[in-house]
């Protein structure tokens, strides 16, 4: 390719001049000449220091020991600082603490972007606020970073108590605040968090000493959340494990599942039909009971009407008997043999009572008979449905057993066919005999399949027997 380039470009591809040869400065090891041979050091041993007079070896500090020492020194230094600050700490003489301590509310975990006006808007719903003080880093109020907590002084103590009860956990600017009373000036022996006090125990030491949730938090709520998270994680892992299994399943299993779902749907349909029938029967029974009740009510009303009419008639007859002369009445009261006879109205009333009792007993007997008849009818229907379900389950079980037996027969036939093929490969002379045997076995297998498919089954597909749809 380069031979076609012009000379000015070919000059660019020309090789450089070779590097001039210079002899090496150092000699090779075999070329070096040693003026003096190697010699021993025995004459110089007396010049060395005696090992017994040597100082003991200094032990160096390992990395782990150094880290442990620094940690221990830091803890001791911090404890000393806390003791010094505790001596000078006095919340009652704090110039920043103003107002009534029993009306002041402490708000922690406040968002750094939350302003005083936002806090006033959120906490003014519980009552009028006298003063709000957001705590900033020392010497940077108004321009520096806030510490994340504030003090709110209410005009009334009841408003502070209301805010203490209801404002805890309220979300302000995307963060849930923690609300508490001011404890520095109200609780004796109280120490702030920076001096080793406070409500929380989240910074005592390691994971075995610390508690996870501090202050007024309801730990049971967090425990429930952890439990729910663990449950969700377990379910997700279970679903992840299921997915590859489902992918590995073959097409025949899917067909089997479809047929099973079809069977379930058919069973469900039959159950729904039987339920609908039961509902209709119950409705008919209810209507019958209602009609019977209405008939009994009408009968009762008619009886009451008849009784009232008879009583009116009797009342009309009684005064006529009173107007008759006493002698006639006395003669009427005595019989032929001088026996006293009862008056006619009393007999009528007694007859009427007897008839009424008889009718009542008869109505109750009829009612009992109707109830018994309905109960027997319901029982017979229920028993019939149960027997049908039992027969249906028995048929299904029998069909399943038949399927299993048929699958076993198919497997045996396949195994026999494989064995005959192997035998044929081994013994080529008997090839014709084996072919005939195989053909006869296949014909028998086909006949058996046709017979079995005609016996309550439609067809075979991938070794799975399909049931005909239920009528």
Swiss-Prot record:
Stretches the record annotates as Required for interaction with U1 RNA: 92-205
Example GO molecular function: mRNA binding
Keyword RNA-binding part of the UniProt annotation: yes
Any Pfam family matching the protein: RRM_1
Gene3D superfamilies in alphabetical order: 3.30.70.330
GO annotation terms (biological process): mRNA splicing, via spliceosome; regulation of RNA splicing
UniProt keyword Ribonucleoprotein present: yes
Positions of the RRM domain: 103-184
Residue ranges, compositional bias (Acidic residues): 317-326
Membrane-crossing residue ranges in chain numbering: none
Subcellular location, principal: nucleus
Amino acid composition bias (Basic and acidic residues), ranges on this chain: 60-78, 210-246, 262-288, 299-316, 339-428
Free-text domain note: The RRM domain mediates interaction with U1 RNA.
Protein name, per record: U1 small nuclear ribonucleoprotein 70 kDa
Species name: Xenopus laevis
């Amino acid at each position: 390719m380069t031979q076609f380039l012009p000379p000015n470009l070919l000059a660019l591809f020309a090789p450089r001049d070779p590097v001039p040869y210079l002899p090496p400065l150092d000699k090779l090891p075999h070329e070096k000449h040693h003026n003096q041979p190697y010699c021993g050091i025995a004459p110089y041993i007396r010049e060395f220091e005696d090992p017994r007079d040597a100082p003991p070896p200094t032990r160096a500090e390992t990395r782990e020991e150094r880290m442990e020492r620094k940690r221990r020194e830091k803890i001791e230094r911090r404890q000393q600082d806390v003791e010094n600050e505790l001596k000078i700490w006095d919340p009652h003489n704090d110039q920043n603490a103003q107002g009534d301590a029993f009306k002041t509310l402490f708000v922690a975990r406040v968002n750094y972007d939350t302003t005083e006006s936002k806090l006033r808007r959120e906490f003014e719903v519980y009552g009028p606020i006298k003063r709000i003080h957001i705590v900033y880093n020392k010497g940077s109020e108004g321009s520096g970073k806030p510490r994340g907590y504030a003090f709110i002084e209410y005009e009334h103590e009841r408003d502070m108590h209301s805010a203490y009860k209801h404002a805890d956990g309220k979300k302000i600017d995307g963060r849930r605040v923690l609300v508490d009373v001011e404890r520095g000036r109200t609780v004796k022996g109280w120490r702030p968090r920076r001096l080793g006090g406070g409500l929380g125990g989240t910074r005592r030491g390691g994971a075995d000493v610390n508690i996870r949730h501090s202050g007024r938090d309801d730990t049971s709520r967090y425990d429930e959340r952890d439990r729910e998270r663990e449950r969700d994680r377990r379910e997700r892992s279970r679903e992840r494990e299921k997915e590859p299994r489902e992918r590995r399943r073959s097409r025949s299993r899917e067909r089997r599942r479809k047929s099973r779902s079809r069977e379930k749907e058919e069973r469900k349909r039959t159950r729904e039909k039987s339920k609908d029938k039961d509902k209709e029967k119950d409705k008919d029974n209810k209507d019958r009971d209602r009609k019977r009740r209405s008939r009994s009510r009408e009968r009762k009303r008619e009886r009451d009407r008849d009784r009232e009419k008879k009583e009116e008639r009797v009342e009309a007859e009684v005064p006529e008997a009173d107007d008759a002369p006493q002698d006639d009445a006395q003669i009427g009261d005595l019989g032929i043999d001088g026996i006293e006879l009862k008056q006619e109205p009393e007999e009528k009333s007694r007859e009427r009572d007897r008839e009424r009792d008889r009718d009542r007993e008869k109505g109750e007997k009829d009612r009992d008979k109707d109830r018994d008849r309905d109960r027997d009818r319901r029982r017979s229907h229920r028993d019939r449905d149960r027997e049908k379900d039992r027969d249906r389950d028995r048929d299904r079980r029998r069909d399943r057993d038949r399927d299993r037996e048929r699958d076993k027969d198919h497997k045996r036939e396949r195994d026999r066919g494989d064995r005959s093929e192997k035998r044929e490969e081994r013994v080529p002379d008997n090839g014709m005999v084996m072919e005939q045997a195989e053909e006869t076995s296949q014909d028998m297998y086909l006949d058996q399949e046709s017979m079995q498919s005609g016996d309550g089954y439609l067809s075979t597909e991938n070794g799975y027997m399909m049931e005909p749809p239920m009528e």
